[in-house]
Amino acid sequence: MSKRTYQPSKIRRKRTCGFRVRMSTANGRAVIRRRRAKGRKRLAL
């Protein structure tokens, strides 16, 4: 039996998927732009 791959950590989540991390790169900003255009309630995390 293999272990579960998702081991939640709030710190890791914020540092990799947070809004400020997204805004720090051009591609990250593109992600936010796409999610705004789609009408997502949560843009990041």
Curated annotation (Swiss-Prot):
Gene3D superfamilies: 1.10.287.3980. GO terms for molecular function: structural constituent of ribosome. Keywords: Ribonucleoprotein, Ribosomal protein. Coiled coil: none annotated. GO terms for biological process: translation. One of its GO terms (cellular component) is ribonucleoprotein complex. PROSITE patterns: RIBOSOMAL_L34 (PS00784). Belongs to the bacterial ribosomal protein bL34 family. This is Large ribosomal subunit protein bL34. The lineage of its organism: Bacteria, Pseudomonadati, Thermodesulfobacteriota, Desulfovibrionia, Desulfovibrionales. The gene is rpmH.
